[in-house]
C-alpha cells in the first residue's frame, strides 16, 4: 500500500481562524464560549455556544461566490485554501484528475431550510430561493472547495454525524493508499448554530444548559453537563509520499492507521461497553503495526455528555487494559465545543501540532474526577512530551466510530 503524508492544514475555529492562531490559543487554554449572537435565545434553555468570530466569506473568495454559499461552505473553502497554500500545491503542475476532495458536513445548512420555510409561510412556495437546495445540501462543501481550487479527482461527502471529519480524512487516506488519487484535500465543516439546530440538540438533552463559559464544557469531569455547540472547519492536504517528495513539499506528519466500526446499538448513545470504539482504535493500531504499549496519547471524542465520556473511557480501558493508566487522554472540545461534522478534522490537526511541538494540551476545566473515569485526562496546563504517535477518536450518532493514527515525521 502507498504511504500517505500530511503536507498542509487549515482551520476555522471558535478560538482562531488559521492553524497557527488556533494552536497558540489551544496551548493557552483559551475558551471559545460565549452568549449566542446569531439569534435571540430568550425562549431557549441554552444560551451559550462556541461561535466563530470575525469571519467574512469575501475575505477568502470573491463576493459573488460567497453569496452562493452558506456559512458551512464558506468555512470549508477558507480552511481548504489555507491548507492548499501551506502545501505549496500548483494545479498547473498537477494532473487535476489525480487531486481530489473528501470534505463532509454532518448537517449542511439548516439555515437555508429555515429561510425557505419562513418564505413559504409568508409568501408562498413560488418565492423560495431557486438556489435553496444547492445552498442546503451537505455535499456542497466538497463541491465548492473543488470548484474554487480546480480539483477534478474523486470528490466525496462523508456524513457520519459527529464522526464526519475523521471518516472524511480516513477515506481520503484510503483513496491515496489504493491509488485512486495522489492528493486529497480532506476534512469537515459545520455551521449549525441557528434556531432549529440549537432547539433540536436541546430537545435531545445533549447540550449543556450552564451559562458560565468556564463551566459549560467539562469533558470527563464529574460535573459535566452536556456539550456546547461549536462551528468551524478543518481541512488537511493528504498526499502520497513519493509525490510529496518529488515536488519538495514539507511533510508535517504521516497517517499510518485508520479504523472504522459501527456499534449497531442505539441512534444517539455509544455502546455502553465501548466495544465498537475499542475495535476502531484496535484496527488503526493493527494497520500501522503499532503495539498498544507504544501509544501514549489519545485525542478523545470527549464531548462532555454523561454517556459519551464514560463509554469512551470504557473503550480505552477495554482495549489497552492496564496500559490505559500510562496514557494521556484529552479533549479539544473543552475549549472549542463540539464542532459536529468538523470536530474530527480540527482534532486531527491538533494531533499533528501536538506531535510537531511535543506538547499535549490540557483538558480545560477538568478538576473533579468521576467514578470509573480514572484515566489521566491532562488537568492543569498541558504537558511537554515527545510523541511518536497520536490517535484521534470520533464517535457519531448512529453508532459511527472512527479512529485515525498519526505518526511523527522524522525521516
Language-model segments: residues:
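Conserved beta-ketoacyl condensing-enzyme motif
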Residues: 6, 21, 27-160, 189-198, ...
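ACP-dependent fatty acid/polyketide chain-elongation machinery
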Residues: 1-65, 242-254, 349-363, 407-411
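Acyl-CoA/ACP chain-elongation machinery
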Residues: 37, 180-225, 258-272, 300-309, ...
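Active-site-proximal alpha-helical scaffold in enzymes
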Residues: 76-89, 138-142, 146-190, 228-249, ...
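Phosphate/pyrophosphate-binding loops at sites that engage ATP/ADP/AMP, CoA/4′-phosphopantetheine
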Residues: 83-95, 244-250, 281-297, 319-323
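Condensing-enzyme catalytic core mediating Claisen C-C bond formation in acyl metabolism
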Residues: 3-7, 34, 212-288, 297, ...
